């Protein structure tokens, strides 16, 4: 703006001095343009100032409205927080009266099952929660009095106030947090229910309560003999005092008058007990199946050697509760494949062995003895195949006799076989023919003894039809082998007789 005014002043001074008409016209046009430009600039600045003032006024109004809204929201939050605090105080007052009381609290197991157990209320949480129905509630901290699993077992150091770990790092329980609405009445143990086959929980030395069944009860000495469930207990039958037992509640049918109805009631109670045990077994089976789905599957399945047997090992393991795809042990976490033995090179350091393994692309089974045995087995198999091919190409006296005696075909084939037989037998010396004759005679005597034993077995086992059939086929094959040996002996004797005749003719 100032520059434009300075230029306009210079143009007016030039007009006063200039006398040339053409220059004056140009200066007058330039002055008109500058005056128009100054007028437009002044009008735009005035509009900008007005818009700025209007915008500032609008921003102030918006800021005032936001400030008022924030004040109202703060007042509402303060009111809500006061209401929540009042509700929390009411719930804390209500549940603080239950501190130290016994109750029945829910516990969710790792496989998803939910069950109620007796517990002791030891604290109230400071935070409000919303239950399933949208009602405000607080959580209570409870310690289970009859823990059946490791995660339910209370920490002794926590009870004494000396535990060095927090709730997430400690292996034992510092108290489970359960909603106050989920708390139920305490189930007091009723020892009058103790009877034979009654399901109970028994406390062992690991402070866990294990399931079992009552064998006998002594109410005078308040002792009970219990058979514990599961295979992990070495002594399944033990004596427990009543203080270390907790009878499980079993729904019973109404009492009936007749004896037959009482018998039906007993059967119904046993069925309920069995259904209870079936539920536990079903939960264990579900956990094992879940474990098999999320467990790394090895390349070799358990019992792979049974492809050569009838699978009796797998049948026995299945009858004992083993689930295919899981590991060994009661919890299904044991190894399936044996630990591979490693044989390191003799006289080499561990660093040198590691360098060898790294040179083999980090193969973990580089020094495995199983791999070496399989490699040696493949080499031996290849050597056996080569030896078999080599032996099959060789033609000895027995192979020649078998081919000549058992071979069948046209007359031309027989003539060629006879010619080959004569030629091959003539190639052998008298000594080799005598040796083969002795061997064949021994085989004939041995085969005759086998035939005699088979005939005795047939006579002794005349009742068993399957054995008779198998022995008959065996006897028939032995007779065929005997006939083959006798034919070979006849051929050898003919060759020897021919040579003797020729010798006599030459001597004559």
Curated annotation (Swiss-Prot):
Q: Which CDD domains match?
A: Tudor_ZGPAT
- All copies of the G-patch domain together span 309-355
Predominant cellular place of this UniProt entry's protein: nucleus
Q: Where is the composition biased (Polar residues)?
A: 486-495
Mind listing the UniProt keywords for this protein, alphabetically? DNA-binding, Metal-binding, Nucleus, Repressor, Transcription, Transcription regulation, Zinc, Zinc-finger
Residue numbers spanned by region Disordered: 253-279, 486-508
In terms of SMART domains, this protein maps to: G_patch (SM00443)
- ZnF (C3H1-type) intervals: 154-177
Q: Which Pfam families did the record assign?
A: G-patch
InterPro entries given in the database record: G_patch_dom, Znf_CCCH
Location in the cell: Nucleus
Give the molecular function GO annotations.
DNA-binding transcription repressor activity, RNA polymerase II-specific; RNA polymerase II cis-regulatory region sequence-specific DNA binding; zinc ion binding
Annotated Basic residues bias: 499-508
Cellular compartments per GO CC: nucleus
Function noted in UniProt? Transcription repressor.
What is the protein name stated in its UniProt record? Zinc finger CCCH-type with G patch domain-containing protein
User: What is the scientific name of the source organism?
Assistant: Drosophila virilis (Fruit fly)
């Amino acid at each position: 703006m100032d520059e434009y005014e300075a230029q306009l002043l210079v143009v007016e001074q030039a007009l006063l001095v200039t006398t040339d008409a053409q220059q004056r016209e140009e200066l007058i046009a330039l002055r008109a343009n500058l005056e128009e430009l100054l007028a437009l600039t002044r009008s735009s600045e005035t509009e900008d100032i007005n818009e700025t003032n209007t915008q500032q006024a609008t921003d102030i109004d918006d800021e005032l409205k936001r400030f008022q809204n924030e004040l109202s929201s703060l007042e509402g939050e303060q009111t809500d927080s006061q209401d929540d605090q009042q509700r929390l105080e009411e719930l804390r007052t209500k549940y603080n009266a239950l501190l130290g009381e016994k109750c029945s609290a829910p516990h969710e197991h790792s496989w998803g099952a939910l069950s109620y157990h007796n517990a002791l209320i030891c604290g109230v949480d400071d935070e409000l929660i919303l239950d399933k129905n949208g009602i405000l509630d607080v959580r209570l901290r409870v310690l289970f009095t009859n823990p059946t699993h490791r995660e339910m077992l209370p920490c002794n150091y926590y009870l004494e106030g000396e535990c060095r770990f927090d709730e997430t790092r400690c292996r034992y329980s510092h108290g489970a947090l359960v909603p106050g609405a989920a708390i139920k009445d305490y189930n007091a143990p009723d020892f009058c229910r103790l009877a034979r086959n009654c399901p109970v929980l028994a406390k062992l030395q690991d402070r866990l309560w294990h399931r079992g069944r009552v064998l006998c009860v002594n109410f005078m000495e308040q002792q009970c003999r219990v058979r514990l469930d599961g295979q992990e207990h070495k002594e399944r039958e033990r004596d427990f005092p009543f203080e270390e037992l907790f009878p499980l509640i079993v729904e019973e049918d109404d009492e009936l008058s007749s004896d037959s109805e009482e018998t039906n009631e007993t059967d119904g109670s046993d069925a309920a007990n069995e259904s209870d045990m079936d539920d536990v077994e079903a939960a264990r089976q579900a956990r094992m199946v879940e474990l098999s789905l999320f467990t790394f599957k090895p390349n070799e399945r358990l019992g792979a050697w049974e492809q050569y047997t009838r699978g009796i090992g797998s049948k026995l393991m299945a009858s004992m509760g083993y689930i295919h795809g899981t590991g060994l042990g009661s919890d299904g976490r044991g190894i399936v494949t044996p630990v591979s033995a490693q044989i390191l090179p003799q006289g080499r350091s561990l660093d040198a062995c590691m360098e060898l393994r790294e040179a083999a692309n980090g193969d973990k089974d580089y020094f495995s003895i199983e791999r070496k045995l399989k490699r040696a087995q493949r080499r031996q198999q290849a050597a056996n195949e080569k030896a078999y091919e080599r032996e099959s190409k060789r033609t000895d006296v027995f192979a020649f006799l078998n081919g000549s005696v058992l071979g069948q075909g046209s007359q031309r084939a027989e003539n060629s076989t006879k010619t080959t037989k004569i030629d091959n037998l003539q190639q052998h010396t008298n000594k080799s023919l005598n040796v083969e004759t002795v061997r064949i005679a021994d085989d004939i005597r041995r085969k005759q003894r086998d035939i005699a034993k088979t005939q005795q077995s047939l006579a002794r086992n005349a009742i068993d039809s399957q054995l008779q059939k198998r022995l008959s086929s065996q006897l028939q094959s032995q007779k065929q082998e005997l006939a083959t040996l006798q034919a070979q002996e006849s051929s050898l004797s003919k060759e020897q007789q021919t040579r003797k005749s020729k010798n006599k003719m030459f001597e004559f």
